[in-house]
Amino acid sequence: MREADNIRQVEALGIDWLGFIFWPKSSRFVHERPAYLPASAKRVGVFVDADIEVVRETAAAYCLDIIQLHGKESPAYIKHLRSLCSDYVAVIVKAFNIATPEDLKQTEPYEGATDYFLFDTKAKMVGGNGTQFDWTVLNDYQGNTPFILSGGIGPDDAEKVKAFHHPMLAGIDLNSRFETVPAHKDVNLLRTFIETIKNEKQ
């Protein structure tokens, strides 16, 4: 997200985390610091194989609460990053591209290195491609690290999300299918989706 008003509107919906893309190749890349950054929602910085010093500097400049890594960052990289950012970053998320149960094996070396995994759709482009993978693949996930479900979840998927259960599911990622244009969220679509999910839980 990049626009101050849109950030305020989305935060007002009670969203837990708000993401800011710091990968220059992304159409959602944050070119400059927004005039407003979330005060109640956690600030998530998304990086792809970035120089570790760049991540550290960005995390400090934006007062990030969470770092989300979408590249081929190693467990050693994550350990080093955590030591550099321990004063302000509380959580590190590592994303993995998933298509088959075999893909889940790549998470094993990261157990204990990261706080959450994020399971995204395997595609040529990194993130935000609007397509889903077969969530039943995650029935084979037996890891101890909680995960965030990502990959093409849209406004029409509320019932599907409510029907999905896994003991390690920690949350869902709402991205490109809730946008009017890259980096700008449709607040009405988000509100309706969130209300549908919450009503089911009451």
For the regions a language model picked out, list residue spans one by one.
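Conserved N-terminal beta1-alpha1 strand-loop-helix module at the mouth
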Residues: 1-202
